[in-house]
Design a protein with these regions (language model features):
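N-terminal Lys/Arg-rich, disordered targeting/topogenic segments
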Residues: 1-11
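Solvent-exposed, non-transmembrane regions of membrane-associated and secreted proteins
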Residues: 9-10, 15-251
């Protein structure tokens, strides 16, 4: 009788083990499927929590207003364009890496994310991040923002679906900037020429390409079409931007 017990125990153990392996396999496949169709769930939850905290930080930043020194400088700037540029440079200078700096909205994709300063891995785990070597909107030139496509809420998951003419809005504490998509390109990771100054203000969104690979980069290039000054940047009615906004025709 004892000789029969051991094989029976082994069969039960093997059955349990096979069940565990089957469940584990299903979970792995489910996670892969979710990542492929939507986004990786665990890192997404982390970023969702961080985004909630960043929204509070951004509201606090907007409510702070300019420092005493900034207010003195602003008093001598009678052009909203110059005031915006000054506030943009000041914000970039005094903001710590990974801190909230503005909001990126892409209506076609129905997305709205708080942006952070910087594009290091730790920064991009919180949301889209500005590239340090590019100016903030309002300074002039090409502003670049990087983001993930498959993890950490995948803010740029569907940027390949953007079409020429689509609107992208960047809300900064000092102004709201509207861009219109010009084109989408696939480039090498070291193709820094896409960030060069081309003589007018642009926004470049950048992410790894293809999905689940860092072999290339997908970049969406947009042109600035309108600026609405906010808070300390405003001069009131009759101002340079306040009357008509800053507009141009996207090419």
């Amino acid at each position: 009788m004892p000789a029969l017990v051991a094989p029976e125990r082994r069969r039960r153990l093997l059955h349990r083990l096979s069940t565990v392996l089957l469940v584990a396999g299903v979970l792995v496949l489910a996670d892969a499927g979710i990542t492929l169709v939507w986004q990786e769930p665990l890192t997404g939850l982390q970023t969702r929590v961080r985004q909630h905290a960043l929204r509070g930080d951004l509201k606090h930043l907007e409510a702070q207003g300019p420092t005493a020194i900034e207010a003195q400088v602003l008093a001598g700037l009678r052009s909203e364009q110059r005031r915006i540029a000054f506030l943009a440079r000041s914000l970039q200078r005094r903001t710590e890496p990974g801190a909230a700096i503005g909001t990126l909205k892409i209506p076609r994709l129905d997305t709205s994310f708080v942006m952070v300063k910087g594009s290091d891995p730790s920064d991009l785990r919180k949301g889209p991040g500005t590239l340090d070597d590019t100016p903030l909107p309002g300074v002039g030139g090409t502003t670049a923002i990087a983001g993930h496509r498959t993890t950490y809420l995948a803010p740029f998951r569907h940027i390949d679906q953007l079409e020429p003419g689509d609107r992208i809005t960047v809300e900064m504490p000092y102004a709201t900037f509207t861009y219109r998509v010009q084109r989408t390109r696939i480039v090498a990771p070291d193709a820094v020429k896409v960030l060069r100054d081309v003589g007018y203000d642009r926004l470049v969104l950048s992410a790894c390409h293809p999905l689940f690979s860092a072999a290339q980069r997908i970049v969406v290039v947009s042109r600035l079409t309108n600026v609405v000054p906010l808070r300390a940047a405003r001069l009131g009615q009759g101002s340079e931007f306040g009357r008509t906004g800053l507009s141009s025709t996207a090419s």
